[in-house]
Amino acid sequence: MQTPTARSSTNVYGKLVDNETRCFHYHSKADVVALRCGQCEKFYACFQCHDELNTHPFLPWRKAKFHIPCVICGACKNSLTVEEYRSTVHCKYCNHPFNPKCKNHAGYYFEDA
């Protein structure tokens, strides 16, 4: 399933359960982040959604591309770079809290984690 974001034509893929990028795997109130695969460069609700829907594994966003947004806030649909995302516990645009447990999966999403 794919959902176009409100602020751009960027699609978010995955086993989505709502229009704020929550998915079958992660669906708490704070699970509103979609992340970009370093291989196909598409945004997915989580690495598990990606891997279940593709023939290639989710690869982390390369450090050389950290200046390019690779995170979408599902609440407001704005994009963030790795550093913008890592530097806060909530969206800098809409103030929606991010799930602090996502840090446990950082290695799946960002090359240097």
From Swiss-Prot:
InterPro entries: Mito_Tim_assembly_helper (IPR052604), UCP017292 (IPR016694), Znf_CHY (IPR008913), Znf_CHY_sf (IPR037274), Znf_LIM (IPR001781). Its main location: cytoplasm. GO terms for molecular function: GTPase regulator activity; zinc ion binding. Zn(2+) 1 binds at residues 23, 25, 46, 49. It comes from the Eukaryota. It is found in: Cytoplasm; Nucleus. One of its GO terms (biological process) is protein import into mitochondrial intermembrane space. Keywords: Cytoplasm, Metal-binding, Nucleus, Zinc, Zinc-finger. A zinc finger (CHY-type) spans 16-96. GO terms for cellular component: mitochondrial intermembrane space; nucleus. Zn(2+) 2 binds at residues 73, 76, 91, 94. The keyword Zinc applies. PANTHER family: HELPER OF TIM PROTEIN 13, ZINC FINGER PROTEIN. This is Uncharacterized protein C29B12.12.
